[in-house]
Curated annotation (Swiss-Prot):
GO terms for cellular component: mitochondrial inner membrane. The keyword Mitochondrion applies. It is an enzyme of class 7 (translocase). Keywords: Electron transport, Membrane, Mitochondrion, Mitochondrion inner membrane, NAD, Respiratory chain, Translocase, Transmembrane, Transmembrane helix, Transport, Ubiquinone. It catalyses: a ubiquinone + NADH + 5 H(+)(in) = a ubiquinol + NAD(+) + 4 H(+)(out). It is found in: Mitochondrion inner membrane. GO terms for molecular function: NADH dehydrogenase (ubiquinone) activity. Its main location: mitochondrion. Coiled coil: none annotated. Belongs to the complex I subunit 2 family. This is NADH-ubiquinone oxidoreductase chain 2. It comes from the Eukaryota.
Length: 348
């Protein structure tokens, strides 16, 4: 792909969420979402492989459906209330439709089935963009909404945490595991959205840091399956020692960074007399923790076969880990002691 085209597409990726996040009008916000979608589709299809083309087609159809639902809901709201403002979503019907449309856009359960399949068909770099940057614009809208249907958000959140944990248990492909991990984390964010939007924002920020560090390490090691992780210690030994901690942090294990949002969310849920919901969410975190432990075990406690097939990947030259990957990995592990400062920063 021409560097000029790539630069234009990356500019579109930056422009779309910026328009959506700064807009207060539904039509402008919808345009920002569509710019974002149209910018990533050529990046997804740049490798002319049947799986990539299939993934791009699935992604386009899903996003087009969600965009049509969103436009229909905002038009219905304007018809019923005479308002196009984001904060004036007062009627329950368009409000529910918009939440479902945004849930389909980001891949919340039970509207999640496209996400693992699409992510599996992409290369790791585009998968990183899809799992992190593409979540920002829909979340910018969700954070501005005043939800009229809190029960729907709780149902979507609990289903996502359970299905995200359950779905990743029998996977061997890293991209599918990270897709189910994404679904589970999005469930935690939606669960707490109506009670503490700033806590949702904090959870989203930490999710972006931890997921980016995992993806960047897999990109450096060129690994896409659990079996290939066994050879990664010979390629980048320092990162291989850090990545299991990053994965356990994604699972929410103390004393790592990922424990912070889960701990704060469970505390907030119990404050609002939702102890059964908090219990279900905590149990679903154990499901997710199991497949993160599988990955950590494959990286640290297994030895690759000592034959020609197993030895060849060790001898490939890899690029040296860059500063961004190292910084993100460190942030994914070491931020828990800074919880009081972070809470003050976010006014939680």
């Amino acid at each position: 792909m021409s560097p000029y085209i790539t630069a234009s597409l990356l500019f579109g990726l930056l422009l779309g969420p910026t328009i959506t996040a700064t807009s207060s009008h539904w039509l402008i916000a919808w345009m920002g979402l569509e710019i974002n979608t149209l910018a990533i589709i050529p990046l997804m299809a740049q490798h002319h492989h049947p799986r990539a083309v299939e993934a791009t087609t699935k992604y386009f159809l899903t996003q087009a459906t969600a965009a049509a639902m969103l436009l229909f809901a905002s038009t219905t709201n304007a018809w019923l209330t005479g308002q196009w403002e984001l904060q004036q979503m007062t009627h329950p019907l368009p409000s529910t439709l918009i939440i479902l449309a945004l849930a389909l856009k980001i891949g919340l359960a039970p509207l999640h089935t496209w996400l693992p399949e699409v992510l599996q068909g992409l290369d790791l770099t585009t998968g990183l963009i899809l799992s992190t940057w593409q979540k920002l614009a829909p979340f910018a809208l969700l954070l501005q909404l005043q939800p009229n249907n809190p029960t729907l958000l709780v149902i979507l959140g609990v289903l996502s945490t359970l299905i995200g944990g359950w779905g990743g248990l029998n996977q061997t492909q890293l991209r599918k595991i990270l897709a189910y991990s994404s679904i589970a984390h999005l469930g935690w964010m939606i669960l707490i959205l109506q009670f503490s939007p700033t806590l949702t924002l904090l959870t989203l920020m930490l999710y972006l840091i931890m997921t980016s560090s995992a993806f960047l390490t897999f990109i450096l090691n060129k690994t896409t399956t659990i079996n290939a992780l066994a050879t990664s210690w010979a390629k980048t030994p320092i990162l291989t020692s850090l990545l299991p901690l990053v994965l356990l942090s994604l699972g929410g294990l103390p004393p790592l960074t990922g424990f912070m949002p889960k701990w704060l969310i469970l505390q907030e849920l119990t404050k609002h007399d939702l102890a059964p919901t908090a219990t279900l969410a905590a149990l679903s975190a154990l499901l997710s923790l199991y497949f993160y432990l599988r990955l950590s075990y494959a990286m640290t406690l297994t030895i690759a076969p000592n034959n020609l097939t197993g030895t060849l990947p060790w001898r490939t030259q890899t690029t040296q880990p860059n500063m961004m990957t190292a910084t993100m990995a460190a942030s994914s592990i070491l931020l828990l002691p800074m919880t009081p400062g972070i809470l003050t920063l976010f006014n939680i």
